[in-house]
Amino acid sequence: MANSPVMNVEVLRYNPEIDQEPHLSTYQVPYDNQTSLLDALGYIKDKLEPSLSYRWSCRMAICGSCGMMVNNKPKLACKTFLRDYSGHMRIEPLANFPIERDLVVDLSHFIESLEAIKPYIIGNEAPALDGKPHPSKELQVSRTKQTPAQLEKYRQFSMCINCGLCYAACPQFGLNPEFLGPAAITMAHRYNLDNRDHGKAKRMSLLNGKNGVWSCTFVGYCSEVCPKHVDPASAINQGKVESAKDYVISMLKPKG
């Protein structure tokens, strides 16, 4: 890139094997109108600092791997372009997560929260028909049939790519690392809205808990930073409505 403009890219570095604490290093990266932050990190790794660690995969904002803080805002590196910044960028790992190395964070709690809410369709147990262990083809079709209107109820919430940007944006997750978090609650709500699913009661026990929907104070920044416009804040608020219904029903129809 002869005669190209140069961006000063300040990157947080941390190797737990040799560093007592994270520190910042600055690299000069030539760029053009099409250079993404992910391209810039690749340039740094290939030509300036081979030990730089960061996550990436698809380059198309589909995999959700390259989330990081750009000038204190959660962004995907592949969707962030150097042309939109004037001379300086500060790149740090996603906020609210433990740092493993450089820009790589430990997503264990995030993954565990997603697993806990059972992010898959839970169907009814299939009864035996005519002595056969599996339901008929007609019954199978009836259990999986879905109209466009039924799909539209949850379609927006199904677009999540598990990038973790909403967790980095969430002040409540920063204060309470046990909070299920925006993405997990959104995913739970997505399946609760699916007419083919019968696992709502199992998920609501988590959403109704102390680390569920009521931990959210509705700042709304999670929806602002979402690269797929999933609107997790809306999903959480809808989850609060369902939780309130559960509470009222439990008061009117106590168990026992």
From Swiss-Prot:
> Key word Ion transport present in the record?
no
Q: Where is this gene product found?
A: Cell inner membrane
Which cellular components does GO assign to this protein?
A: fumarate reductase complex; plasma membrane
Q: Which residues are noted in the entry as [4Fe-4S] cluster-binding?
A: 160, 163, 166, 226
Picking any one GO molecular function of the record gives: succinate dehydrogenase (quinone) activity
Query: Any idea where the 2Fe-2S ferredoxin-type domain is?
Result: 7-97
Q: Where does [3Fe-4S] cluster bind?
A: 170, 216, 222
The reactions it catalyses are: a quinone + succinate = fumarate + a quinol; a menaquinone + succinate = a menaquinol + fumarate
Disulphide bridges: none
According to the UniProt record, what class of enzyme is this?
A: oxidoreductase
Record keywords = 2Fe-2S, 3Fe-4S, 4Fe-4S, Cell inner membrane, Cell membrane, Electron transport, Iron, Iron-sulfur, Membrane, Metal-binding, Oxidoreductase, Transport, Tricarboxylic acid cycle
Cofactor info, note text? Binds 1 [2Fe-2S] cluster.
Domain of life, source organism: Bacteria
Boundaries of each 4Fe-4S ferredoxin-type domain copy?
A: 151-180
Pfam families membership: Fer2_3 (PF13085), Fer4_10 (PF13237)
Name the cofactor(s) required for activity, per the record: [2Fe-2S] cluster; [3Fe-4S] cluster; [4Fe-4S] cluster
Q: Name the EC number(s).
A: 1.3.5.1
Which biological process, per GO, is one annotated for this protein? anaerobic respiration
Question: Which positions does UniProt annotate for [2Fe-2S] cluster binding?
Answer: 58, 63, 66, 78
Q: Which residues bind a menaquinone?
A: 14, 237-240
NCBIfam families on file? dhsB, PRK05950.1, PRK12385.1
Which PANTHER family is this protein grouped with? FUMARATE REDUCTASE IRON-SULFUR SUBUNIT (PTHR43551:SF2)
The subunit structure is: Fumarate dehydrogenase forms part of an enzyme complex containing four subunits: a flavoprotein, an iron-sulfur, and two hydrophobic anchor proteins.
Q: Which family does it belong to?
A: Belongs to the succinate dehydrogenase/fumarate reductase iron-sulfur protein family.
Instruction: List the protein's name.
Output: Fumarate reductase iron-sulfur subunit
> What species does this protein belong to?
Haemophilus influenzae (strain ATCC 51907 / DSM 11121 / KW20 / Rd)
Gene (UniProt)? frdB
